[in-house]
Amino acid sequence: IGDDFQKLYPGANILVATKKDFQKANRQQLFAKIATGNYDAVIIGHSQLGKIPVSKERQVMTIQTQIDDILQGIEELKKSEGSKFQIKAMERTRKSLQKQLDKLEKANQDDTLTFEQLGIDRLFIDEAHEFKNLFVATKLQNVAGISNSASQKALDLFLKCRYLDEKTGGKGVIFATGTPLSNSITELHTMMRYLEYDFLRDHGLQHFDNWVAVFGEQKTDYELKPAGNGFKERTRIANYTGLPELMSMFKQVADIRTADTLKLDVPDCDYQVVQVEATPFQQELVQELADRADAINAGNVDPTIDNMLKITSDGRKLGLDPRLIDPSFEDNPDTKLNRCVENVARIHAETAEDRLTQIIFCDLGVPHKAAGEAEVEGEDADDVKDKKSIAEVESLEEECDFCVYDDIRDKLIARGIPAEEIAYIHDAKTEQQKADLFDKVRSGEIRVLLGSTAKMGTGTNVQKKLIAVHDLDIPWRPADLEQRAGRIIRQGNENKQVQIFRYV
């Protein structure tokens, strides 16, 4: 990004911070440099933004506001004789926030410069959807699409946005994202809280419950059970009212551009859905999953022994290759994995003259020690903690006894593809190693790159010779599928026609 910025603005004085700059021993020097230097721009990574602290006073004020909102919600529920379960859930959230507040008030403010002291008057956030898990205080319970989980990095960004709003009159924050909504339209409220909080507050819509009461309606309907063996009732925000008014409000801060309006020079894409029939053995295992789900729903199973999360995980593994459940199972030639190998080998041979490249996306059966791996050369304890937190919370990758990546690589080599032309994104442990790897893919030296959504879904610019992407499994969020496609349907691709294979 630093190089691109300098090309666009040759006379600009920019500072590109490195991971080493953000190590604990070096931060104070970096912050002093930012505060005293005459920089036009300071470029940092998402994880580094959270290492620039916000003042203790602002943190206390924000947490106290959350507590006050929850107390108000509890009182309203009590007056309306609301569910005791809802009241207890909100009370647990209040106690958790109170603990944070007590800890914060007891902590001593060190001499580290805060975000407010650095002289920053504009904040540009690329891939802004990564901060969508902002705290939500709501009385709604068991409504699909509404998450009560909150991430620290989202809260940290919110605090910085509020400071810049105060300093610039609501003109200090710019978000850029191709996927502002990844799961539900309710995420629109989060984006509006970041970018036009004062407007929401002036109209009494800063609280989610008020906002959804105006623009959304709850609907209960039957949906397929996770195990696929029947249906169950599910409540979600399914009907929306006043959409023209809502979009008018959002467009006060949103400049929306679609691929059609931008007319970008990107290749045409042919989407191929590769449908693989389930084997009798897989069908038998699916029935076992259904039986396990029935036992869990009947309360006959200790949740530490079996639960719906385990069933969902086993179902994903079974759909890709039964060997992910048990490596001793037969390697059936007609699994998604083997069909993918056939397509990759065929395209590799057909495009050998131009040395065109391919990407295989797979979040299951990643290389051993890659899932949740935290220890990376050159990073300090905070970096390790961040990585562990991401791995534990998102669980985007799953390591199994059977390694999908190794199986694919071995079969491609057996079909004549040189081993040195195949690489894993997981082998790039540092930013420099990743940059070197991407250079080799762009040049065609490496022609098959395997990786996961988490490691390769964003920030991967290897499109120059990319002719095909293979979605071996389907990620949890629709937005992740868009991010995968964005690796190939991208400016700078020399190919006019490309393919995306999705194996089901």
Predicted regions and their residues:
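Conserved Helicase C-terminal RecA-like lobe
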Residues: 264-448, 454-456
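Conserved helix-turn-beta segment of the N-terminal RecA-like "Helicase ATP-binding" lobe
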Residues: 1-22, 33-36, 195-199
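Conserved segment of the helicase C-terminal RecA-like domain
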Residues: 489-504
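A short beta-strand element within the Helicase C-terminal
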Residues: 187-190, 460-474, 499-502
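Inter-lobe coupling linker of SF2 helicases/translocases
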Residues: 27-72, 79-81, 85, 92-122, ...
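A solvent-exposed, charged loop/short amphipathic helix patch at secondary-structure junctions
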Residues: 60-79, 136-150, 372-399
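Catalytic acidic motif of RecA-like/P-loop NTPases
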Residues: 47-48, 129-135, 180, 456-457, ...
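Walker B catalytic acidic pair
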Residues: 126-127, 472
